[in-house]
Curated annotation (Swiss-Prot):
Residues that bind S-adenosyl-L-methionine: 44, 69, 96, 118
Source domain of life: Bacteria
Pathway connected to this protein: tRNA modification; N(7)-methylguanine-tRNA biosynthesis
Biological role: Catalyzes the formation of N(7)-methylguanine at position 46 (m7G46) in tRNA.
Protein source organism: Lactiplantibacillus plantarum (strain ATCC BAA-793 / NCIMB 8826 / WCFS1)
Interaction with RNA, as annotated region: 124-129
Active site (catalytic residues): 118
Name of the protein described by the UniProt record: tRNA (guanine-N(7)-)-methyltransferase
Catalytic activity from the UniProt record: guanosine(46) in tRNA + S-adenosyl-L-methionine = N(7)-methylguanosine(46) in tRNA + S-adenosyl-L-homocysteine
């Protein structure tokens, strides 16, 4: 997600270390200390402006969430929302979500969300896709046994690639949607900003898949 530069972003981030970390490696294995109380931990890699993760935190106070976003101006938008309306079960990480094994101990995470990741459509870039086997290996390491990935995209090519990649990795498909909005009600589906804006243009694909226990 590209947004205009927010000159105020670095100052806001620096002013709220209680809500956002710029070095999540320092919290590896002790993320629960950042929350009001220990609870199951779920993370979103690439959180955009935060509509999805904020709504999830509101709906599920019994779960702790970490939103990971690399773009300064984008994560500052999430932070601004949190400053205005605090959520004790949501923390932010200003970092590259591709490095999850540097941020979380093995089996520290219960569920991982990938929403509308960059499809990297050229075949020579397939290793950059967040459902490539090397990323799946990292996710399996930080997720608890039988941990789940929830994946959404509007890109048919990325959807098909992800199905194949997950299947080759030995993952079990719990549910697969070829047109999520044709069957899901607003109560069942928490939308991202991108999804809300572009879902009318074509189908939204979704996968819920589980890693087999080692």
């Amino acid at each position: 997600m590209r947004v205009r530069n927010k000159p105020w972003a670095p100052k806001l981030i620096a002013a709220h270390p209680e809500l956002i970390t710029e070095d999540p490696t320092q919290l590896k294995g002790r993320w629960q200390s950042r929350f009001a109380k220990p609870q199951p931990l779920q993370i979103e890699v690439g959180s955009g402006k935060g509509q999805f993760i904020i709504e999830m935190a509101k709906r599920h106070p019994e779960i702790n969430y970490v939103a990971i976003e690399i773009q300064t101006s984008v994560i500052a938008i999430i932070l601004k929302k949190l400053v205005e309306a605090p959520l004790p079960n949501l923390q932010l990480a200003h970092a590259d979500g591709q490095a999850v094994t540097a941020f979380f101990e093995p089996h520290e995470v219960d569920r991982l969300y990938l929403n509308f990741s960059d499809p990297w459509p050229k075949s020579r870039h397939e290793k950059r896709r967040l459902t490539y086997k090397s990323f799946l290996s990292s996710y399996r390491e930080v997720l608890k046994p039988n941990g789940q990935i929830e994946f959404k995209t509007d890109n048919r090519g990325l959807f098909e690639f992800s199905l194949t990649s997950m299947n080759n990795f030995g993952m079990q498909f719990e549910q697969v949607w070829l047109d999520l909005h044709a069957v899901a009600t607003p109560e069942d589906n928490v939308e991202t900003e991108y999804e809300q804006k572009f879902s009318a243009a074509g189908p939204i694909y979704k996968i819920i898949a589980t890693f087999p226990a080692k």
